[in-house]
Structure formats: C-alpha cells, structure tokens
A protein has these predicted regions:
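C-terminal motif of bacterial Sec signal peptides marking the signal peptidase cleavage site
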Residues: 17-21
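Sec-dependent N-terminal signal peptides
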Residues: 10-14
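A residue-level marker of the well-folded mature domains of exported/periplasmic proteins
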Residues: 22-165
Length: 165
C-alpha cells in the first residue's frame, strides 16, 4: 500500500506540474510526451528496487490513460552524491520535464536544487527528505515519503508494547 501511494505521488506530481505549465518551455505549445529523470541512491536497496519497478508500471498506466508518452530515465547513483549531481546535470541537459530524486546525502541537496532552479525544472525528492532549509528554497520542490519523527515514535511504541507484553 505504502509503495503504491508513494509511486502514485511520485508520478502524479511531475505530471501535474507539467500539465499546469510549470515545466513547460516557452516555445513548446503542446507536449506529446513527458520526460522524467529519476536518480536512485542505490539499486541494491530492496525497497527502492521495488519502487523502481512500480514507477515503470505507473508510467505505462499513465500512458494508457492519457495517451501522453512517458520517457523514464532511471539511473543508479551508486551511493555517491557526486555521481548523482552529474546525473542531475545530464537530466537537465536532456530536457527532462521533472526530476525524481532519491537523494544520496540528505544534507547535500542544495547543488541539485540550484541546478533545477536555474533550469526551471521541478524536483520531487522521495524516500529521503532533504533538510528543511533546502526544501524551503523554492516552491517547486516536493517531498514524498514518511515523516521520520513519526516513524520513530511508532517504532518506539511498538517496542515498548512488545516489552510490556
């Protein structure tokens, strides 16, 4: 359930941005495709690997529902922030309409944000939330994922309940 909701949000956010014109270039009147750049911090992560497969499935569903072709460029950052920064540069140079980033280092999002702002490309960070100061820098940055504090409280409650039992 959580993966499906996360995938749906990840896919829907850039699509809505594009349809509302926030990712549109001035010279483009009508788009017949959406190009999304997706950088995943590490392929081997079981959850993220499942998420990748579901993103591809959601892209196919979206194409069938809207007739709009979805080009997904999904890459592995290999747990390297510098590799991920290079991937973002490449996505922007390819003309991606939106970026979906599973950030390697949540405290190093500023470089990605600056590049996206300069190119006017919205960014959806997922599963790992950048620091609040970075997220507040621009109104076209989004985060999809769990609230870490809330998750910790729930986990603590489960442990306490198990201990009391």
């Amino acid at each position: 359930m959580r993966r499906g909701l996360l995938c749906g949000c990840l896919f829907l956010m850039p699509a809505l941005c594009l349809m509302s014109g926030c990712g549109e270039k001035a010279e483009q009147e009508e788009k017949n495709s959406i190009r999304l750049g997706v950088s995943i911090y590490r392929w081997e992560d079981a959850f993220v690997s499942t998420l990748r497969a579901e993103l591809e499935e959601k892209a196919k569903e979206y194409e069938q529902e809207t007739g709009l072709k979805v080009v997904l460029d999904i890459v592995d950052a290999k747990e390297s922030q510098s590799v991920q920064n290079g991937q973002v540069e490449r996505f922007i140079s390819l003309g991606c309409d939106a970026l979906c980033i599973n950030i390697v280092d949540r405290s190093a999002a500023s470089d990605i944000i600056v590049r996206a702002m300069d190119a006017d490309v919205p960014v959806v960070f997922f599963n790992r939330e950048p620091v609040e100061e970075d997220m507040d820098r621009w109104d076209r940055l989004y985060y999809v994922g769990a609230d870490a504090k809330e998750s910790a409280v729930i986990q603590g409650t489960i442990l306490a309940d198990a201990y009391d039992a």
